[in-house]
From Swiss-Prot:
Protein name: Protein Vpr
Gene source species: Human immunodeficiency virus type 1 group M subtype G (isolate 92NG083)
Disulfide bonds listed in the record: none
Stretches that traverse the bilayer: none
Record-stated family: Belongs to the HIV-1 VPR protein family.
Lineage: superkingdom: Viruses
Protein encoded by which gene: vpr
């Protein structure tokens, strides 16, 4: 009969502690790439939908991860993960 392998990895921190740390890291990254009023609106939407619950925390983590992934994939100027390998050229003279 099959048995699940024993947990032989390092001790993990509690789920809620890890989740809050992940949310904090995502928020810090999101404010570098998206307008604060827009992020505030997203936070208000999540709060109005889920209230102050773990379900709301999980929802905002999921949404921020998706938004950041798409943002980087499309080609964030701060990232090396974009679709096109060449830099985008702007019209007009370059900066001195």
């Amino acid at each position: 009969m099959e048995q699940a392998p024993e947990d032989q990895g390092p001790q993990r921190e509690p789920y809620n502690e890890w989740t809050l740390e992940l949310l904090e890291e995502l928020k810090n990254e999101a404010v570098r790439h998206f307008p604060r009023p827009w992020l505030h609106g997203l936070g208000q939407y999540i709060y109005n939908t889920y209230g102050d619950t773990w379900e709301g925390v999980e929802a905002i983590i999921r949404i921020l991860q998706q938004l950041l992934f798409i943002h980087f994939r499309i080609g964030c100027q701060h990232s090396r993960i974009g679709i096109t390998p060449q830099r985008r050229v702007r019209d007009g003279p370059g900066r001195p």
